[in-house]
Amino acid sequence: MNDALYEQLVPRRQKASGILIIVLAVAVAIFGMPLVGFLSFLIAVLILMIAFYFIFPKLNVEYEYMILNHDLQIDAIYNKSKRKHMLSFDIQSAEIIAPKKSPRLNSFHPDKTYDFTSGNENADVYAVMISLDQKNSCVYIEPDRKMIEHMRQWMGSKMFLD
C-alpha cells in the first residue's frame, strides 16, 4: 500500500476567558484574606488547587490534524499530556474546502460550527463544509502548505485556494 500520512500541530492562543479565570482566582486569594481572614485564604487555596487540576490544563490546548489518505482526524491535546479525540471525517465527502473569507462560502449556511484553529486573526484558516450527523457543519482548520497539498490530491475541484 502507498498510504499518505501527514500530521500537524496547531497551538491555540490562550483566550481572554482563561486569563480572566487566573486573574480572578489570584484576586480572590489576595483581597479575600483581609476581609474574612485566614479562613478565606484557605478556601481560596482549595479553590485554586481544584482549578489547577480541572480548569488550568484545559487552558493550554494544541490541535493535532492527522490526515491519512482522505481521512482527517482532529484531536485536542490538553497541557501537552492528555489527548481527546474531537472529530474525524472523510474529506472526499466535503461539499467544499475554501479559505474562511472566500466568497465561495456565502451560499453555505451550517447548522453547527467547529473551530479547531489557533485563534490568530492573521492565520490562513480554511473552512470545510461537510455533512456530519445529518447536519450541515462547518469545520475551521488551519492547515499548512504541505497539508493543503495532501488534501488537494483527494479533493480535486472541490478545494479552492483563493
Segments the model singles out, each with a brief description of its role:
Residues 1-26:
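N-terminal membrane-targeting/pre-transmembrane regions
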Residues 31-43:
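Transmembrane helix interruption/hinge and helix-loop junction motifs
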Residues 43-61:
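Transmembrane alpha-helices and immediately adjacent membrane-cytoplasm interface residues
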Residues 59-71:
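A cytosolic-side transmembrane-helix exit/cap motif
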Residues 68-86:
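Membrane-cytosol interface motif
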Residues 86-106:
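Structured surface patches comprising rigid loops and adjacent beta-strands/short helices at the edges
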Residues 100-120, 124:
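Cytosolic, membrane-proximal regulatory domains of ion/volume homeostasis and mechanosensation machinery
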Residues 115-162:
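A membrane-cytosol interface segment of integral membrane proteins
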